[in-house]
Amino acid sequence: MQLTSDQLTESKPVHPLDLGSLRAALQALANALDIVSSPEFSAVDLRWRDTLVAGVVQHFESTFELCWKMLKRQLEREVPSPSELDGPSYRELFRLGYQRGLIPAVEPWFEFRELRNITAHTYSREKADKVAAGAHALLAAAKALLSAIESRNHV
């Protein structure tokens, strides 16, 4: 069977990315940050504070992971050859996201990756506090990324 030129250039319909998990992660991180940023937080028992900060760290990690996965999925839709994205490091992925206008700068994302890595293997209150301090910046950057992806998916 011979294909016509129209059939060769037809592409499958592209459905919008399902961004529900990223939206949920952003909301969970925002909720956790609201709690640990509240005036009442300092009056809470130390055990509760440690547990709540650990929750912020967990939400930071899951939000970061979802961000780079959604960034990769969006880039797979945009680059001429999606197989180009099979091997690049996370740094190259964020650079491509910057070049494509999905993120305004790469440096914050490199910092978020470092923060995510410091809690991956060992845990300490100091490390948790450091990650929690960076969570506000991640929340803002992740919201901007979500907005950029939504605009390209007509959501």
Model-derived features: positions:
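Solvent-exposed interaction patches of small proteins and small membrane subunits
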Residues: 1-155
